[in-house]
């Protein structure tokens, strides 16, 4: 599928990444201006701050609303930076534009709601402003693309996707699981769409920001949106995932930006080997499916059920152990054989039901 897109034309040093930075929330005028001034001194061109804050539970700081918008306008006037904030309703859009907000982004909870997205799209019709769309809280690429389609069909051509990770009940390392395969697939399907990484919300802890920034660059992301606060330990929201402008500047200075396009004869030879191995894999899978169909015919003739749970568990256990010996994760092997088993069952059901 395709979106009708135009270049973002954002101020940058014409190098990856372009960086959007600022506090999670616009708490006070002093906090906003102090943070913005420090970021501008470090060379940041785009300032971010949450004016309206959707919180998981009531009672937390939900933003200062319209009261904070003049502070954002002041940042723009005094530092020359562009300013950006999150919008979730048509009223937010109207107020943000009234105060000269340069870039709007749409949060994960809003992206997950097609009704809310359509209302925002309708409010943006006829307006030329960059709009960035965060992934929905659940790992649903079609929902993410659908949200961007609604905005694009309203006439917004300057767009980007923000990858902020996906919610999970079991939070071990990350606040939101990165599930990199989803933005990678988004890039494959819409290669001209810029993708921005939000390491603050993926990690949930400031010590994870640096490695997540580097991983995003290694995967070819165009930009970073990072929460930075003049005094992060005293932040009114998400204190643990914010860093000072000095720390952010240090993190950015350590990034290794690799060439996206250059290829050499050596890598072409290796890629040819990959192609040949992929062909071998396809041949082996086809051969395995032929044997599965023969088993399906046997089950039909002997009135056996397709699903043999003990056999399936045996396969997963043995192949997981084999994969570990070969340097592959058990989860990866399980995913592969779950897919193979699903296709085997489908083909056997076709035979039994003929």
Task: Give residue spans per PLM region.
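Domain-level signature for soluble enzymes in the chorismate/prephenate branch of the shikimate pathway
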Residues: 260-354
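Catalytic alpha/beta core domains of metabolic enzymes, predominantly
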Residues: 12, 116-250, 254, 259-265
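Catalytic beta/alpha-barrel core
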Residues: 64, 80-89, 93, 102-116, ...
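Active-site mouth loops of central-metabolism enzymes
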Residues: 17-34, 58-60, 82-86, 107-108, ...
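Long, contiguous binding/interaction regions
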Residues: 36, 40, 45, 67-82
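N-terminal amphipathic alpha-helix/helix-capping segment at the start of soluble metabolic enzymes
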Residues: 1-20
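Hydrophobic faces of well-ordered beta-strands that scaffold small-molecule active sites
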Residues: 17-23, 45-49, 83-85, 104-106, ...
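Glycine-rich, proline-tolerant flexible connector loops at the mouths of alpha/beta enzymes
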Residues: 48-67, 230-239, 295-304
